[in-house]
């Protein structure tokens, strides 16, 4: 993030660091929008800042360490630090706030989705400018506000929190139970994003499939029309809205409830991308029971096969955990067999990490870290073989590619993504120089490209 908005040379400056997942990123965007609306300058560096805000992650141990280290660096370089995010809600082993215990000199600590609390702390330590010409309300920037992503794609969070209590996860203790955003608010933000040039909208939450469950799918309103607060209606409305802009809508964190089947016709019709990010975590029924996964009784293999019958182009992405407490070699082999048979297009895998506060730590049967890592490596070898074979099948096909990078207007090629590739987590399409000398590639625009090769998780394509 470069300096976001400069109000004046004398406006107080806030350094800002955003760590963690896409959900945390949207929290950062809300805070940055409010800061800018009130006349503060913002910067991604500590130098020259009057204070620093660190939005933290507290899910796994590596993320906790990164967050604590970043807070320490900010204190050392600047001295005035406000901490927000998931780590801010975490309790230390002996009780008390973990951040306060490790860094007692921070100015304030809040949990996630706490824009007002963060702003209160900023006001207490760095009074806002009182200039009527720059002291704006957030809507002056458009409802979409400031975004930390490139201009051509954006995340939109449709709910906060989660009603599930998976034994490996501590997110509900930090972000609370499911709270769905009013459907009218979501669609208003989406329209502002499309109007602002966004070509790919990535729908995120902790549990996208559960959107509206907490409000019993009550009817909201959009453009004066009644619209049910439910994922199917939201996806359909987003697809209709995106169409005039030629934009993509991509769904993430979609739990495999039966209701997900209703989305497939929208994908087959091209309303939303035929791409499902489904966090399955494992395949063996006993492991899923120990994980207390929602929809653990679903026959996921049959579900995926049925999805492909309805929408042959669908790409299924998922994440898995290897070495969960008590996992036997038979249970792990079941997972490998599932990967081969389900042919998951894009897969990630984590070796189980005993996150502080997770119920799974007390299940018993903790596996040695060496075995957990060995199983993760074995899983990824299978996943990469599946992915490579599926990418080879695309050679010779023509695909629409969203250009992410194109130095010199693409005269020497560039990088982009197809519908099968979400930013940051999937592969890319390596673009060769266009066939025609007159053709240019521009970031944020689509190009047709012929797939000519595959390299690892990536495709190689010739724009035309």
UniProtKB/Swiss-Prot annotation:
Subcellular compartments: Cytoplasm
Catalytically driven reaction(s): L-aspartate(89)-[ribosomal protein uS12]-hydrogen + (sulfur carrier)-SH + AH2 + 2 S-adenosyl-L-methionine = 3-methylsulfanyl-L-aspartate(89)-[ribosomal protein uS12]-hydrogen + (sulfur carrier)-H + 5'-deoxyadenosine + L-methionine + A + S-adenosyl-L-homocysteine + 2 H(+)
Cofactor field: [4Fe-4S] cluster
Membrane recorded as keyword: no
Residue positions binding [4Fe-4S] cluster 1: 21, 57, 86
Record domain Radical SAM core: where: 148-390
Pfam families: Radical_SAM, TRAM_2, UPF0004
Gene3D superfamilies in the record: Methylthiotransferase, N-terminal domain, Nucleic acid-binding proteins, tm_1862 like domain
Keywords: 4Fe-4S, Cytoplasm, Iron, Iron-sulfur, Metal-binding, S-adenosyl-L-methionine, Transferase
Enzyme Commission number(s) from the entry: 2.8.4.4
InterPro entries linked to this entry: Elp3/MiaA/NifB-like_rSAM, Methylthiotransferase, Methylthiotransferase_CS, Methylthiotransferase_N, Methylthiotransferase_N_sf, NA-bd_OB-fold, Ribosomal_uS12_MeSTrfase_RimO, rSAM
All copies of domain TRAM, residue ranges: 392-464
UniProt-annotated binding residues for [4Fe-4S] cluster 2: 162, 166, 169
Any one Gene Ontology BP term: tRNA modification
Any GO molecular function: aspartic acid methylthiotransferase activity
Domain MTTase N-terminal, chain residue ranges per copy: 12-127
PROSITE patterns the record matches: MTTASE_N, MTTASE_RADICAL, RADICAL_SAM, TRAM
EC top class, as a word: transferase
Cofactor note: Binds 2 [4Fe-4S] clusters. One cluster is coordinated with 3 cysteines and an exchangeable S-adenosyl-L-methionine.
Its job: Catalyzes the methylthiolation of an aspartic acid residue of ribosomal protein uS12.
Entry's family note: Belongs to the methylthiotransferase family. RimO subfamily.
Name assigned to this protein: Ribosomal protein uS12 methylthiotransferase RimO
Origin species: Albidiferax ferrireducens (strain ATCC BAA-621 / DSM 15236 / T118) (Rhodoferax ferrireducens)
Gene: rimO
């Amino acid at each position: 993030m470069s300096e976001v908005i400069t109000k004046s040379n004398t406006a107080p400056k806030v350094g800002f660091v955003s760590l963690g997942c896409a959900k945390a990123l949207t929290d950062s965007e809300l805070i940055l929008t409010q800061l800018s609306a009130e006349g503060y300058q913002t910067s991604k560096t500590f130098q020259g800042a009057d204070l620093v805000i660190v939005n933290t992650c507290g899910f796994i141990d590596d993320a906790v360490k990164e967050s604590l280290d970043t807070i320490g660096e900010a204190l050392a370089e600047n001295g005035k630090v406000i901490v927000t995010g998931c780590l801010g809600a975490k309790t230390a082993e002996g009780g008390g706030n973990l951040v306060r215990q490790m860094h007692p000199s921070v100015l304030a600590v809040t949990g996630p989705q706490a824009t007002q609390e963060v702003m209160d702390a900023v006001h207490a330590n760095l009074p806002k400018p009182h200039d009527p010409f720059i002291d704006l309300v957030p809507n002056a920037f458009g409802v979409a506000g400031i975004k930390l992503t490139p201009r051509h794609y954006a995340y939109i969070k449709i709910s906060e929190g989660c009603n599930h209590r998976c034994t490996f996860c501590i997110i509900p203790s930090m972000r609370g139970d499911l709270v769905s955003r009013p459907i009218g608010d979501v669609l208003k933000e989406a329209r502002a994003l499309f109007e602002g040039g966004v070509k790919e909208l990535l729908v995120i939450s902790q549990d996208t499939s559960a959107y509206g469950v907490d409000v019993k799918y009550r009817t909201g309103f959009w453009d004066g029309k009644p619209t049910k607060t439910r994922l199917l209606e939201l996806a359909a409305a987003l697809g209709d809205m995106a169409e005039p802009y030629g934009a993509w809508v991509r769904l993430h964190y979609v739990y495999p409830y039966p209701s997900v089947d209703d989305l497939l016709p929208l994908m087959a019709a091209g309303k939303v991308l035929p791409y499902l990010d489904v966090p399955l975590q494992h395949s063996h029924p006993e492991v899923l029971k120990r994980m207390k996964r929602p929809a653990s009784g679903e026959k996921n293999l049959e579900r995926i096969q049925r999805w492909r019958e309805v929408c042959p182009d669908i790409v299924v992405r998922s994440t898995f955990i290897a070495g969960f407490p008590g996992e036997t070699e038979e249970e792990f082999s079941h997972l490998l067999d599932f990967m081969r048979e389900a042919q998951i297009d894009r897969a990630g895998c984590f070796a189980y990490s005993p996150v502080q506060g997770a119920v799974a730590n007390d299940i018993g049967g903790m596996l040695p870290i060496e075995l957990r890592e060995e199983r993760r490596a074995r899983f990824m070898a299978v996943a990469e073989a599946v992915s490579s074979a599926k990418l080879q099948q695309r050679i010779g096909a023509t695909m629409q590619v969203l250009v992410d990078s194109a130095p010199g207007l693409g005269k020497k090629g560039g990088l982009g993504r197809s519908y099968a590739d979400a930013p940051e987590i999937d592969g890319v399409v390596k673009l060769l120089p266009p066939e025609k000398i007159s053709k240019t590639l521009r970031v944020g625009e689509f190009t047709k490209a012929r797939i000519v090769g595959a390299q690892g998780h990536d495709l190689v394509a010739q724009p035309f």
